[in-house]
């Protein structure tokens, strides 16, 4: 009788032991972390359609309940990107910025990150926004952009052209992560946040090196920051202390500032920069048409709590982008970012950029 050859170690499975779902789920459901390569194996099974819906659901929920490590989430994101369609960066580069949140905060606010992205682009910083339709709220970023007249179904080359020509592009997640459809269907059926909520902000197909990344869970925001730190990104991972996955104007926010491979935790109070306290009800959104109307109003110069929150988040993204330069100072960067965000709206530049972006996508 011949002896089977020994299992060889690989980059995905450095221990050499063949992972199984029983092994992985057994560890997660007893609160144990996974060995290097095991998370990557599980995600590859999911992305290739090999995993069953029951296995996907059990993995997604138990990983979040266990609380994933940055190393585990890095493996999830890396495998997801391995299967993704990528936005070509030979022309637009990677000194771009994303403004996106995990969702799952249950607040159903207007699409602050979508409006802020337009303001940032109007301020002269190239934006590649990664987003999707609503999962738990009434309207996601994709829904609102579509209601504004944008074509959201663009492919990699077309998104790159938008960034090159207009200064902003939207990468609609299903177009770039077709292999994620297996997990996406299960995620919608489960209806509660899972570890997969963390992956959208970590898998932008244009690999922007800067970002304002909102996280609805304070304990997982630090995990996300750790992933960005391994990439050498300049990112502000933010969690409103009212629970929002944005920089909030209702109270303070906690910021994990990622720069040059390090993570620094800070408390940020918008009142220090002259912002009035808002009530979360003043930031509440509606369906896509309602949120599109709010966006048109803010970009058209309407004052009030929604504008304040948009300016604050746009400034945060500009601060993150400034952090790509090692000599960026915190307070001066905020002062500059706030001034640029306000001017982008008040000068009409943001409103004009949206109109130009819509026209450009319709002509592609």
Curated annotation (Swiss-Prot):
Pathway: Amino-acid biosynthesis; L-tryptophan biosynthesis; L-tryptophan from chorismate: step 2/5. GO terms for biological process: L-tryptophan biosynthetic process. Its EC number is 2.4.2.18. InterPro entries: Anthranilate_Pribosyl_Tfrase, Glycosyl_Trfase_fam3, Glycosyl_Trfase_fam3_N_dom, Glycosyl_Trfase_fam3_N_dom_sf, Nuc_phospho_transferase. PANTHER family: ANTHRANILATE PHOSPHORIBOSYLTRANSFERASE (PTHR43285:SF2). The lineage of its organism: Bacteria, Bacillati, Actinomycetota, Actinomycetes, Mycobacteriales. Homodimer. GO terms for cellular component: cytosol. Anthranilate 1 binds at residues 101, 132. 5-phospho-alpha-D-ribose 1-diphosphate binds at residues 101, 104-105, 109, 111-114, 129-137, 141. Mg(2+) 2 binds at residues 245-246. It comes from Mycolicibacterium vanbaalenii (strain DSM 7251 / JCM 13017 / BCRC 16820 / KCTC 9966 / NRRL B-24157 / PYR-1) (Mycobacterium vanbaalenii). Mg(2+) 1 binds at residues 113, 246. Anthranilate 2 binds at residue 187. Its cofactor is Mg(2+). It catalyses: N-(5-phospho-beta-D-ribosyl)anthranilate + diphosphate = 5-phospho-alpha-D-ribose 1-diphosphate + anthranilate. GO terms for molecular function: anthranilate phosphoribosyltransferase activity; magnesium ion binding. Belongs to the anthranilate phosphoribosyltransferase family. This is Anthranilate phosphoribosyltransferase. Binds 2 magnesium ions per monomer. It holds the Pfam family Glycos_transf_3. Keywords: Amino-acid biosynthesis, Aromatic amino acid biosynthesis, Glycosyltransferase, Magnesium, Metal-binding, Transferase, Tryptophan biosynthesis.
């Amino acid at each position: 009788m011949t002896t089977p050859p020994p299992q060889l170690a690989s980059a995905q499975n450095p221990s050499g032991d063949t992972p199984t779902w029983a092994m992985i789920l057994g560890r997660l459901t007893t609160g144990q972390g996974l060995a290097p390569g095991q998370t990557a194996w599980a995600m590859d099974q999911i992305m290739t359609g090999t995993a069953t819906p029951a296995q996907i659901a059990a993995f997604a929920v138990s990983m979040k309940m266990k609380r994933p490590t940055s190393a585990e989430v890095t493996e999830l994101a890396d495998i997801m990107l391995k299967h993704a369609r990528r936005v070509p960066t030979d022309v637009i580069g990677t000194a771009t910025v994303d403004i996106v949140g995990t969702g799952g905060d249950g607040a159903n606010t207007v699409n602050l990150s979508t409006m802020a992205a337009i303001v940032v682009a109007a301020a002269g910083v190239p934006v590649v926004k990664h987003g999707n339709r609503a999962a738990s709220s009434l309207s996601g970023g994709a829904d609102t952009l579509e209601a504004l007249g944008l074509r959201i179904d663009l492919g990699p080359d077309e998104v790159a052209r938008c960034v090159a020509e207009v200064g902003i592009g939207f990468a609609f997640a299903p177009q770039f992560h077709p292999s994620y459809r297996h997990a996406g269907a299960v995620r919608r059926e489960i209806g509660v946040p899972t570890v997969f909520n963390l992956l959208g902000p970590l898998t932008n197909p244009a690999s922007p090196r800067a970002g304002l990344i909102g996280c609805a869970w304070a304990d997982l925001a630090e995990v996300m920051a750790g992933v960005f730190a391994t990439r050498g990104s300049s990112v502000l991972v933010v969690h409103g202390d009212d629970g929002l996955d944005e920089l909030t104007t209702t109270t303070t926010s906690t910021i994990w500032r990622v720069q040059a491979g390090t993570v620094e935790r800070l408390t940020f109070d918008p009142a220090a920069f002259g912002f009035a306290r808002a009530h979360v009800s003043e930031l509440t959104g509606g369906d896509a048409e309602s949120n599109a109307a709010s966006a048109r109003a803010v970009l058209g110069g309407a004052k009030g709590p929604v504008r304040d929150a948009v300016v604050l988040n746009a400034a945060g993204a500009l601060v993150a982008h400034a952090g790509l330069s090692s000599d960026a100072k915190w307070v001066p960067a905020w002062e500059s970012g706030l001034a640029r965000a306000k001017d982008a709206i008040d000068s009409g530049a943001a409103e004009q950029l949206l109109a130009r972006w819509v026209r450009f996508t319709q002509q592609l």
